[in-house]
Amino acid sequence: MIDMLNNTYIHIPNIGSTTEFRIWDCGIRNWEDFLKNHNMLKLPRVKRRRLLSGVEESIEQLSSGNHVYFAKRLPTSLQWRAYRHFKEKTAYVDIETTGLSPQNNRITMIGIYNGTETKTYIRGINLEEALFELGKYKQLITFNGARFDLPFIEHEFSVTFNHIHIDLMYPLKKIGYSGGLKKIEVSLGMTRSDETAGITGLDAVRLWNKYERGNSEALETLIKYNTEDVVNLEKIIQMTHPRMIEQELKDCK
């Protein structure tokens, strides 16, 4: 299957999707191939030089594992192209809160899954340790995290992330999956446990309120709900990533 990051040019300054599509249309499928066969493309001299320089730099930065280089240059909607290259340094992230506004509400829980282990960080217990854990990774995967999870975390800890961030909501919508995370899970044939089936975001707020009033079982249910959220993010991208690539290449035709 085509490696989308190694076939990306749109992150190079002043190179747009039209030029990228032209390169793909010529059958060039990776940066090394471009360096060998760029002469088959009819390009203005300045643009050719810009592409050659950008491709050489991209090869070097990818070889050194510099995720920040791509996080800063890839459009937000296309960060998913980096998924495979930074898969081993990925954290799947989901938060629970008391409401929708980072300024007026609080994070109650942060769930982080690295593909092997899930860690849960809870307000009043260990919430501040989540920032150290997130610092171990180069790539974050969320659902609606660009508008919700990351702004909340950045406000909570007064930080700015430099990770590659794949907000699955956008590439999923492009391949036909719209609506909330739970609706998309159903569309993909995924099921929740009996304890968490049917729980909504509003229910999660209520569970936290019950916990604050002394109900420890409510906290356990909230942890399980949050854990299923982050674990399912990995399942979703594994199931849909090939279709994201297929759709991207189809769009250029």
Model-derived regions: residue spans:
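N-terminal accessory regions of nucleic-acid-interacting proteins
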Residues: 1-87
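Alpha-helical elements of the RecA-like P-loop NTPase motor core of helicases
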Residues: 21, 150-151, 234
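Active-site catalytic pocket residues across diverse enzymes, especially alpha/beta-hydrolases
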Residues: 27, 157, 240
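Conserved RNase H-like, two-metal-ion catalytic cores of nucleic-acid enzymes
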Residues: 71-139
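Acidic active-site catalytic centers that drive phospho-/nucleotidyl reactions
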Residues: 94-96, 149, 167, 229
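Short amphipathic alpha-helical segments
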Residues: 104-105, 153-155, 238
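Conserved DEDDh/DEDDy metal-dependent 3′-5′ exonuclease domain
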Residues: 109-194
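Acidic, Mg2+-coordinating catalytic module of metal-dependent nucleases/exonucleases
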Residues: 189-253
